[in-house]
């Protein structure tokens, strides 16, 4: 036995040294990749699980997979939300006959039924958590096996989040969109927490009861199960290995496991001078646990762990390893262009890298549990995570919805409790109205699942004050609506310290320019930056709690990291600091400048940065002439135009304008007056202690001359597994390589070698050919199963072609489940495609608005007049001048007019408004049109279909704040 352990350790060390994921053949556990060789059918199939079904016309696909590729800008509930079937053939050798065989699904959206050889194995509800299908006693050992999965993306109010997609601010999308693996173990094994139903148990749970800089104790609770009819005399052997491959702690515990029984084995590992995990020093250890029987390894698991301790205080915020850390975070949606949520693990990693380079030390996984690969990357690169139960502006009192929510909450904690990056668990249904009993139950089950002082739950205070006992950390800690009714007022006396304070979302919905597309000008991008830096400095929406200006603020999360499509509106949500393709806007660099210049992570980023927020393209914009903004986290910035010094500014000089930001460790903006515009080159130098530590130059773009193909690697070598994805940008540039930022050029793409262009030849989704946006195009290339070179070429009329190459590496260190015997799958991606017709709402919005003669209200807050209701601007508001309800708003037309529809946009997107709408032809006799309660996000047109001279809106109740409107439009 000792010799075997030494051999295993040596092999583990070799694997760690060369960055490989190794499989020890005698470990008793085999994990087989199942991401390739699937057949897919879009639509429902009678008895689609039959082994003798003719599936030759089905579409050959690889996972991750969305049931229908979509346009990049696919808002307005235009995506596929129906049924789909998947089939995977395989044959297993007889050596596995006495083994436990399960298939692990990381994510299937939304509900699914799993079959093997025509027999139902299990069903699962909810697309954001994985599950296990046990095939142990169902395998056909004499021939082919057919694993079939019926997936439903149809609306389901009983499965959280539950809200229909046409009312959602994001999309669920569809399909088997995360990894699938077959796991083969002995029938005496270490369990999977998602298969077991044990509070704070199943699998392995690692906690750290003692953590100091001098020593730490890791407590292991390993759950083992015996499926045999024989008692087993065993031992559990655990080793902790550092990054250099040295075993620094180990423990062996004997255990007797009776037949058909299970047990949790507890062990302690002691570490001297531990390398603690921290966002800026994300030290990880390898924990390997073996289940031993005499000289045989029955099972083995290996995981990365990080030793750290956290605490939150109401007065000072967040502490990690005893040191205070201010969280600067972003909200991230997991969706990508064309493929929705179905992106490979490498794309999850790239998002983490991009967030870290963008100056963030934290991310809010809004509004659902993210991909395991994303969390593993957060552990590896050092990104704190707020993990959320799935929910958004919806609560269903049905007991099925509630029980599924509880189960998802339990499973989320069991899956992710060992991640050092996860430091806050958002157990509130985001922006929803729900009973105190629900908050109490989720709070109690969360602390039961993660006992001790390292579990912190989070929710909103304002609007939920009665739930104070059931959250450990609060967002929105304000005592009341602003006393003057101005939602952009910030009165320090209104801010309270009930619990530790964070702001979950800021930066969208209010301000000079909260949303901007890369198709817009540099000046529009700068408007977004100016808006957000003012908000950071304390001049934001009242329930953002003044952000950096609040002395009790522990951190905040900008909305949002990335642009994304949503069901509630046709237009893409342009709130991101990067677009859907992850191409950065100016605001990416503004927030990057908030990071500490003294903190660098080797191989990831260097601390000092400088960025000129200008295309230097036109004298029409102040951002190229009199207000050239430079973002930097350094002490001093010099700006040159054509080698002539425009000026020098210091951090100290700029601090008075941005004092709150600077006091929280952030940076001011540096704004230079360059006078008259000149073509040429702007160059910025950033200095620390008088030395230049970073530079950035921007040259005036000339005439479009060429295409540049930019394969975004981020140091990641793509894997030839038939499943990996590579992001590629296509830039329209002048002869010197400067981006033509306003180009909408049509380009064509050719991929050759060992890669495939995702969505090639599908004109419906506009990938090839495609029109670039803001001078930049984008596409995914998927790898084949053969390692080799991939060449990506782009052409456009009148421009020199661009070309780039990348090589893939073999799929080593892991095994794939071999394909079974079946007919050739001949289906095409567009078979049975579902193109939703232009919605009635969209057609209505394309009509001209009717002129409204006048509007009357009961009261108005200063600065928010009634005229804002009918000024054709959604971003100007009417707010009632008093808290009294109801508030009545009456519109009058010049004469009785046929009105097809009305569109009512309420002032606050997260508040719920109970209201009724009536119409009249004479102002005396009123006819009820409808009564409803909705949030500010639900602003699609409603049918009127009658003659109207007067329309009366009565706002009867508001969940948070006063009655308010953005706009009322009639069509």
Predicted region positions:
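Accessory carbohydrate-binding/adhesion or oligomerization-edge regions at the termini
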Residues: 20-71, 150, 154-159, 175-177, ...
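Extended carbohydrate-recognition surfaces in non-catalytic/accessory domains of CAZymes
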Residues: 23-106, 160-167, 173-176, 186-188, ...
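Disordered, acidic Ser/Thr/Pro-rich linker "stalks" and the adjacent N-terminal cap
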Residues: 27, 55-63, 116, 827-895, ...
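Accessory beta-strand-rich segments of carbohydrate-active enzymes
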Residues: 32, 44, 81-196, 227, ...
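Active-site-adjacent substrate/metal-binding segments within catalytic domains
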Residues: 65-92, 96-105, 109-116, 122-125, ...
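Beta-strand-rich structural segments
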Residues: 220-223, 290, 614, 628-632, ...
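Substrate-binding/catalytic cleft of secreted carbohydrate-active enzymes
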Residues: 352-354, 362-591, 605-611, 618, ...
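Trp- and acidic/polar-enriched beta-sheet ligand-binding modules for extracellular glycan
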Residues: 882-885, 908-971
